[in-house]
Structures are given as structure tokens and as C-alpha cells.
Amino acid sequence: MLLVTQMLFNVGFYLVVPFLATYMSQSLAASGTMIGLVLGLRTFSQQGLFFVGGALTDRFGVKPILLIGITIRITGFIAAGLSTTTPQLLIAVVLIGFAAALFSPAAEASFSVAGRSTEDSGIITRAELFALDTVFSRVGALIGPILGAVLLPIGFPLMCFIAAAIFGVLLISHALIVPAVSTPPSASVWNSLTTVLRNKLFIAFAVAYSTGLVAYNQQYLSLPVELERATGSQDAIGWMFVFASVFVLLLQMPLARWAQRRTATVALAVGFISTAASFALIAILAPFAPAAGWLGIAPILVMLMLLHIGQMVAVPIARDLVGIIAHEEHVGTYFGFLNSFGGLAVLISSLVLGRLLDFAHTPQPAATLPWLVLTAIMAASAIALPKIATIARSRKAQV
């Protein structure tokens, strides 16, 4: 049931969020910096506050935190649908983000506990369960943009209200049908927080891994800009998400199995090198006039493929590594902090990249700058994460 829930979460999310940048630029006349700020705050209010949801999950359990989070997200989508100015939309977007700060760590903790059980039983490994989670999530990420692309001509507010209705169904199903999931109890929220913050290896891992969320967030921030540079409009943005979702559905499990046969060191290095290459490609091409027709979109499609290959290889391995670094305790808080570091990284990078992306709408030498910055930080993580994984695995072997 958790897998189906993840799918529906993404249907509602991807019905609206991929179109935020387009709506703000075309309907609210927002600048690139303002769009970067709003998207960055959306991610930070979600990922940056995950540690709150994680600690509350460890203290009070999965189900109550899930229900509260879903209720807040319904409120956020309704508020977004009623927004007519950028400040109003900003408040709504923060609510949408904070809601996930509550329910997402609860779901992550559930998968970690369930994955350990299935691995001990010899059914599937925890990394493979996380990969299945990605597949189900991608089904939702496929349906959401398709539905959004169809509804976009009707209006952004209607899309928001439909998303609210989807989460309303989830609220009822979780309240009445979905059973509670048991996680290892925590003596207090403070105990969970201090335990995580004292784990220096985890802090290093979270900082290095935070760039992965920065990369993923570029689908909402940088992709529309590159699409406009290549085609003259952002109209095809929904179909770019559809392409990415189909690509992930086809390759997630094969690539996850490939990564499982390698060490975590190799998988993380390959994943982040692929992500760095995706941005390096656009950095090379951005200063030049795009080719005519579909050839102009080809580099964007290659960028998306390389980006998602990197995610598909690295993310299941990294999520499994969290449980190892955490010694299987306080997993909700650990996952919360992992995403909080990512959210902070996205907020900072969005402000910087949002400004640089103002130069990337048209071919010019300065258009390469945001893509060079992204390439550099992904390359840094490709170097750091394998070293951290080696230390974590060696400590586990000594226990």
C-alpha cells in the first residue's frame, strides 16, 4: 500500500509543481530571480524541514504525522489555486513544501524498516525496495505531467484544485484503511536530533549527497530556461517530464540491479559522474544557436537521460547507506536530516542559479555559467561520496 501511496503523492505533486515556473513567468511576469526564490523556498520548506518530520515520526509514529502532512498539503494546493499574486503563491508553495516535510520522512522510515525486514527474509534487498519505490513514484510522475499538460490550457487554478482532491482521497484512505507501521521508538525528539547531529560521518555524507537534490531540482528551475533557449518557448515542458518518467520506468530496476552488483563506491561515483555529464553537455552548447526542429531538443533529451541515469544508479544505494550509517536507529530523523541538507542546498543554489539563468534564455557566452556551476558541484560529490561510502561499509564490517 505504501508503494501505491507514493504513486498518488506524485500524481498530485507533478500535476502542479512542474508548471510553477511557466505560470509565474507567463501569468505573473516574475523574474528569473523571483522564480528561483519561490522554487527554492518550496524545496527548502519541504526538504529543509524534513528533520522536523523525521524526529516527530520517530517520537509519535508514522500514521499521525502522515495525516497531518497530507492535510497541510491539501490546504496549500487550495491556496495556490486561489492565488493571484506572487506573494500569495509564495505562501501557498511554502505550505505545499512543509506538508511533505512531515509525511515524506514518515514514508522513508516505513520503507527503511520494511526493506530491512524483506532483506532479512531473503525476498528483496532494501536497495531494491527503494528502487521499486522509485518505479511507483515515477508512474505518478508520469501521470501527473500528462494530466497537467492536458489541463494547463484550462487554467493553473483548476490544476491545483484537482491536486487537492487527490490528496483528499489519500487523507481518507490513510485514516480509514492504511495500517500503522511500527518504527523503532525514540525516547524523545531531542534525543533523536542530538544523536544524528553527533554522527560526523552522516553529516559529511548528507552535505556531499545534497547536490543530488540540487540536480533533480533543475528540472523545475533550469530545464524550462534551456527549453526556451532551444525552441523559443516552454510549451513542451510537460512532455519533457513525461519523457523522463517513461525513461525511468523502463530502466530503474535494471540499473538498480546493476548497481547492486557493484560496490557502493562504484555506484555512487558512476551516478554522480553521469549527472555531472548531463550539465556539462548543456554548458558546451548553451552559448551557440540551437539547431532547427527536433535537433534543437535532442541535447535536452540527452541531458535528461544522463541526469536520470545518475539518479537511478546512485539514489537507491545512497538511501540504503543511510540505514547503515544510522546503525538502523532513529531512521526517520536521519532521513529527515538528509533531505534537510538537500533542501538548504537547493535554496542556496536556486538563488545563485536563478540569477545566472537570466543570461541563459538566449544563446550567448554567459549562458554557459549556470551549467558550469552545476557540473562543478556534481563532480565534487562524485569524488567525495565514494570515499564516505568506503568508510561506512568498513565500519559496518567491524561491528
Q: Residue spans of the language-model regions?
A:
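Helix-to-loop junctions at the C-terminal end of transmembrane segments
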Residues: 49-61, 250-264, 357
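Juxtamembrane intracellular "pre-TM" segments in multi-pass secondary transporters
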Residues: 1, 177-208
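C-terminal transmembrane helical hairpin of 12-TM major facilitator-type secondary transporters
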Residues: 266-315
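C-terminal membrane-cytosol helix-exit motif in multi-pass small-molecule transporters
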Residues: 165-183, 384-388
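Short amphipathic helix-loop junctions that connect adjacent transmembrane helices
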Residues: 18-33, 221-236, 240
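Cytoplasmic helix-loop-helix junction between adjacent transmembrane helices
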Residues: 94-137
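A membrane-interface helix-boundary motif in multi-pass transporters
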Residues: 152-165, 355-378
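Conserved MFS/SLC helix-loop-helix module at the cytosolic interface between two early adjacent transmembrane helices
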Residues: 47-84
